[in-house]
């Protein structure tokens, strides 16, 4: 303990549980989360990295610690040193050599001491602090933050209001039966961050202004910057050999191909349809509009360039499970980020048969593990990791051909898994099936039936215009005939989709529908990356003018529809 120091509790709270818990296991878990995810505590921080006990850096930090704090923690229990890596902020005043030294002073008490090697400001907490728990009952834990008595209270306001809240949330949500995957667990985190910053600033950020796609440019661009950085670090760490040529299957906007080319990896992208950005910003990138038929590869016929030795699948949908299969036939490595669940010939169904008995997992978890099992059956050396990208689907599968080769009977294994069925590629043009293609006469007939019911549901009048009532969708659904339902089902839609598409007639909100009154505009959250659209005059006739007994509520001059 720091000689002569006393500690005081600055904030504490009790967490209650429904059954008896293991306090030590819970405490160790939150300490682990606290050290590993400082970026969840402070937006100044990108990540943290554990310092190796056998390194020169470990000894340098401890020497600086001893000089600064006047005691040596080398003999303390479970001593750890964590490097805190800050975000690359403008006018940065934070240290590039910031660390936290921590140790268990008691079984349920950990001390934390900040250290910098360059004298600059620490990006995390600048004063020593402690995390502890008490055990009031068998089913509760009292979480505490402590500070040294002589430390200024001002230094700990953020800890009291924000940091403690996050730590308490972790404590309440702990499930020791579940194992959590760590982010970028296969990589040197510090090296990854340097690579990511380089790709983002040198190649990514400048593309935001010229973005022509409908997606959010910052999310799309920074996500692909993260994926490109990850693949680069896999190669640098020898987890994957540098490819002679890669192919990004289902490359979408093509940005990942562009970024990988920029950092020195040769390769191209394939997608069933081109994107607008291919002809503008990415006109010099090798992006090919063509369908991918994995069964051509399975039949040993040429489909990709002959020197391709890395297959990439980034949200490749129905081709996802085929990528390990095609890689096996080509005897090459693959990198895969599964997203929408597909099996070899359609939507994936979670029957859990490959997971073993009594395992309950989500559709995505089952699909992900099934895809891993496909790669393992083919004999790949498989590794799994979690990417640091702005996406809900960020688990990746890395498949490498082992030195001894893949399984000896690749063709038999593939035939066994695919059962001789035929793959159906996605069409180039995707048919719109959202109830808009219901024949006009049927669409107007159904709309009129629903309109009359909503209008007569209430006698309410707003400024001289009968506005009808707010009707639960379940009541409106009861009005539909079997023929009506079939028309909607054939368009992959239902009642709610139908009503939303009759925008000038109905407003749908929280499982109810009412008549649209354009005098009462609905405020919609506009996507920040899209410019505000000018009001347009529609060619469709005004429904209210034709069918409402009081006519159009806004009048011919102000109405956006034809009168």
UniProtKB/Swiss-Prot annotation:
A zinc finger (C3H1-type) spans 536-563. Belongs to the TRM44 family. Its main location: cytoplasm. This is Probable tRNA (uracil-O(2)-)-methyltransferase. It catalyses: uridine(44) in tRNA(Ser) + S-adenosyl-L-methionine = 2'-O-methyluridine(44) in tRNA(Ser) + S-adenosyl-L-homocysteine + H(+). The keyword Cytoplasm applies. The keyword Lyase does not apply. It is found in: Cytoplasm. Pfam families: AdoMet_MTase. GO terms for cellular component: cytoplasm. Probable adenosyl-L-methionine (AdoMet)-dependent tRNA (uracil-O(2)-)-methyltransferase. One of its GO terms (molecular function) is tRNA (uridine) methyltransferase activity. Signal peptide: none annotated. Keywords: Cytoplasm, Metal-binding, Methyltransferase, S-adenosyl-L-methionine, Transferase, tRNA processing, Zinc, Zinc-finger. Its EC number is 2.1.1.211. It is an enzyme of class 2 (transferase). GO terms for biological process: tRNA methylation.
């Amino acid at each position: 303990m720091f000689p002569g120091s006393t500690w005081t509790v600055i904030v504490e709270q009790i967490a209650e549980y429904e059954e008896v818990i293991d306090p030590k296991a819970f405490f160790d878990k939150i300490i682990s989360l606290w050290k590993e995810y400082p970026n969840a505590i402070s937006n100044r921080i990108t990540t943290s990295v554990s310092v190796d006990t056998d390194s020169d850096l470990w000894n340098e930090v401890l020497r600086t610690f001893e000089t600064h704090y006047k005691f040596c923690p080398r003999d303390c229990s479970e001593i750890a040193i964590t490097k805190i890596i800050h975000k690359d902020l403008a006018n940065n005043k934070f240290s590039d050599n910031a660390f936290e030294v921590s140790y268990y002073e008691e079984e349920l008490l950990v001390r934390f001491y900040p250290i910098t090697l360059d004298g600059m400001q620490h990006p995390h907490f600048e004063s020593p602090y402690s995390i502890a728990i008490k055990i009031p009952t068998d089913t509760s834990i009292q979480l505490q933050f402590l500070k040294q008595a002589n430390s200024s209270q001002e230094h700990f306001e953020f800890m009291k209001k924000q940091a403690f809240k996050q730590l308490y949330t972790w404590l309440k949500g702990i499930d020791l039966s579940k194992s959590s995957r760590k982010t970028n667990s296969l990589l040197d985190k510090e090296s990854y961050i340097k690579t990511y910053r380089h790709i983002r600033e040198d190649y990514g950020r400048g593309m935001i202004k010229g973005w022509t796609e409908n997606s959010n440019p910052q999310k799309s661009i920074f996500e692909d910057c993260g994926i490109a950085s990850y693949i680069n670090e896999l190669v640098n760490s020898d987890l994957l050999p540098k490819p002679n040529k890669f192919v990004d299957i289902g490359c979408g906007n093509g940005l990942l191909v562009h970024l990988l080319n920029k950092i020195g990896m040769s390769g191209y992208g394939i997608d069933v349809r081109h994107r607008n950005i291919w002809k503008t910003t990415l006109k010099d990138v090798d992006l090919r509009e063509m369908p991918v038929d994995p069964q051509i590869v399975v039949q040993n016929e040429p489909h990709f360039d002959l020197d391709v030795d890395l297959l990439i699948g980034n949200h490749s949908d129905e081709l996802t499970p085929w990528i390990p299969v095609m890689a096996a036939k080509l005897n090459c490595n693959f990198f895969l980020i599964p997203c929408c669940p597909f099996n070899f010939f359609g939507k994936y169904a979670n029957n859990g048969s490959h997971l073993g008995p009594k395992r309950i997992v989500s559709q995505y978890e089952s699909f992900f593990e099934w895809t891993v099992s496909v790669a393992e059956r083919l004999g790949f050396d498989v590794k799994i990791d979690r990417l640091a990208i702005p996406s809900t689907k960020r688990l990746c599968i890395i498949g490498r051909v082992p030195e001894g080769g893949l399984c000896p009977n690749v063709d038999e294994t593939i035939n066994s898994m695919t059962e001789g069925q035929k793959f159906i590629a996605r069409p180039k043009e995707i048919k719109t099936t959202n109830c808009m293609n219901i024949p006009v006469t049927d669409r107007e007939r159904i709309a009129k039936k629903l309109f009359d019911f909503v209008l007569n549901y209430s006698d309410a009048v707003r400024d001289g215009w009968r506005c009808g009532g707010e009707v639960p969708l379940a009541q409106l659904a009861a009005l539909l005939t079997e023929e009506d339902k079939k028309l909607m089902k054939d368009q992959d839609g239902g009642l709610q989709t139908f009503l939303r598409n009759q925008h000038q007639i109905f407003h749908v909100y929280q499982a109810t529908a009412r008549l649209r009154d354009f005098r009462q505009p609905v405020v919609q959250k506009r996507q920040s990356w899209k410019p505000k659209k000018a009001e347009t005059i529609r060619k469709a006739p005004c429904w209210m003018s034709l069918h409402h007994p009081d006519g159009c509520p806004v009048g011919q001059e102000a109405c956006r529809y034809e009168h």
